[in-house]
């Protein structure tokens, strides 16, 4: 009897073992089928492109990296720092921008594109849409629409909103550009720029606009710079092929971490004329400028200086002062507050005096901007 009981127990254990083995085998099969089904999905998951900076990811099925970004901005303005005849005491302006960047690795370096579309909405149901930038770059070359290298290479004119009350150069134009970086602090740029395209054509005077009709020669911009430690020196020149005049700018930057400052000077080859590289946002077509619009340009020279100080991780103070041979004085100061990442709140106040127009203007801006 004891032998029979032991035999039944052994048989029962054998059956349990078989059942367990069968269950395990079935689980293995189910797991394998699940992994096989998931494998294609895993390959379709987003892959990031760390080589080109944050935000880039591979377009599925390609070796091209894509980055989508932009910003939304709304601001209230009190008078106009650029115009002593501004009639509106206040106005409200809202803007949205969408940027799309791509990058693909090639034997000549990254092949990149940059596209930015802008939408603006102003007081009085006024709205506009435009292609702000659209360009292709490879191996130091850039072709398409971008800001003039006369501005881009030099770093514009300070960390304030109204930074170009004293005109510092053209923006948003077609160009063929080559930039060189030696890797030891030395850089250089040369650019052929479309003489008939720019967002600022009303700033160069009537003679300039008359000359654009049958003109096809490009403008030429060339510059060089050197950076060592906290100091950077850059020089650039631009030749306006329509007016057959130009301008040169030189700039020194100092960056000591929390504190940075710059000094930039410009020379106009003919102080009695406006040209694309020494123009004016104040001319006889839009304000109180005298009949000779050049009186509201640089004259023979202009200079800009500015400084920024990081008060704490979320608060930065900025200031800029500019003056011209034609006795235009502009001063601006603001505070840039970033309460959270990618959100900017920026109040600013400006003062401008136009000696030739016997006029001055106080102006203010309160800006809210979210970048993504």
Language-model features, listed with the residues they occupy:
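N-terminal periplasmic/intermembrane-space "pro-region" immediately following the signal or transit peptide
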Residues: 1-69
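Outer-membrane beta-barrel "beta-signal"
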Residues: 30, 339, 359-372
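Outer membrane beta-barrel
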Residues: 55-78, 84-199, 218-227
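Transmembrane beta-barrel strands of outer-membrane/channel proteins
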Residues: 72-76, 115-119, 143-147, 190-194, ...
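Hydrophobic, lipid-facing positions within transmembrane beta-strands of outer-membrane proteins
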Residues: 94-98, 132-134, 172-176, 218-222, ...
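Residue-level signature of outer-membrane beta-barrel architecture
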Residues: 102-104, 138-140, 180-181, 226-228, ...
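Repeated loop/turn-to-beta-strand initiation elements of outer-membrane beta-barrel proteins
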Residues: 107-110, 140-144, 184-190, 230-235, ...
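Detector for outer-membrane/organellar transmembrane beta-barrel domains
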Residues: 217, 222-330
